[in-house]
């Protein structure tokens, strides 16, 4: 990411954090992200995260079906 895009985003987050104190905890992560972007680190592998999310959804659906199958019918 280029510097001209990162600086306005950083200032926008600072303005939001000034108005909403819930975003204060987000500032250290943002600074770390900016440092990583300047060092040129690659983005995380999104495909692995998507696959992990799908596996969790399948597991939760199977657990829900098993739970509903074990409930008595009234």
From Swiss-Prot:
It is found in: Secreted. Residues 1-22 form the signal peptide. The modification Lysine amide is found at residue 39. Keywords: Amidation, Antibiotic, Antimicrobial, Fungicide, Immunity, Innate immunity, Secreted, Signal. Its main location: secreted. Residues 40-74 form a propeptide. GO terms for biological process: defense response to bacterium; defense response to fungus; innate immune response; killing of cells of another organism. One of its GO terms (cellular component) is extracellular region. Expressed by the venom gland. Antimicrobial peptide. Is able to kill Mycobacterium abscessus subsp. massiliense in a dose-dependent manner. Has antifungal activity against Candida spp. and one Cryptococcus neoformans strains with MICs values ranging from 12.5 to 200 uM. Also shows an inhibitory activity on C.albicans biofilms at high concentrations. Shows low cytotoxic activity and has weak hemolytic activity on human erythrocytes. Shows anti-inflammatory activities, since it decreases release of pro-inflammatory cytokines, and increases release of anti-inflammatory cytokines. Belongs to the non-disulfide-bridged peptide (NDBP) superfamily. Short antimicrobial peptide (group 4) family. Negative results: does not show antifungal activity against Candida glabrata (ATCC90030) (MIC>400 uM). This is Antimicrobial peptide ToAp1. It comes from Tityus obscurus.
